[in-house]
Amino acid sequence: MARVTNSPASRKRRKKVLKYAKGYFGSKSKLYRYAKEAVQHAWQYAYDHRRKKKSDFRALWIVRVNAACRNAGISYSRFMEGLKAANIALDRKVLADLAVRDEAGFNVLVKQAQDALKTKAASAKKA
């Protein structure tokens, strides 16, 4: 009895991997053995970086808010503490967008944060 190799499915699978590896340099785009490895690494990097992207954006937002805070004469940590004391629940993404697009609106938030810090300090002295 003849050996069954399921050749059409094997060829389709290999062609699919080589299609994913299109644009890779040298043997990684030509030879199935190396293309498969390169594609698997690429998918692993893609998976990891989809998760890393979230922390990268958070860090970018913090840098932008910090720069705007320094221009307004307050440190980032004091600003965030003041927002919390003033019960202003804006996330860093929105704050960064305000800092870049609406400087006047951001300065209003800075003023509110500074006022909340003053009232917090005054209530701490009384207690």
UniProtKB/Swiss-Prot annotation:
InterPro entries: Ribosomal_bL20, RIBOSOMAL_L20_CS, Ribosomal_protein_bL20_C. The keyword tRNA processing does not apply. Keywords: Ribonucleoprotein, Ribosomal protein, RNA-binding, rRNA-binding. GO terms for molecular function: rRNA binding; structural constituent of ribosome. One of its GO terms (cellular component) is ribonucleoprotein complex. GO terms for biological process: ribosomal large subunit assembly; translation. The keyword Membrane does not apply. CDD domains: Ribosomal_L20. Pfam families: Ribosomal_L20 (PF00453). Binds directly to 23S ribosomal RNA and is necessary for the in vitro assembly process of the 50S ribosomal subunit. It is not involved in the protein synthesizing functions of that subunit. Belongs to the bacterial ribosomal protein bL20 family. This is Large ribosomal subunit protein bL20. It comes from Opitutus terrae (strain DSM 11246 / JCM 15787 / PB90-1). The gene is rplT.
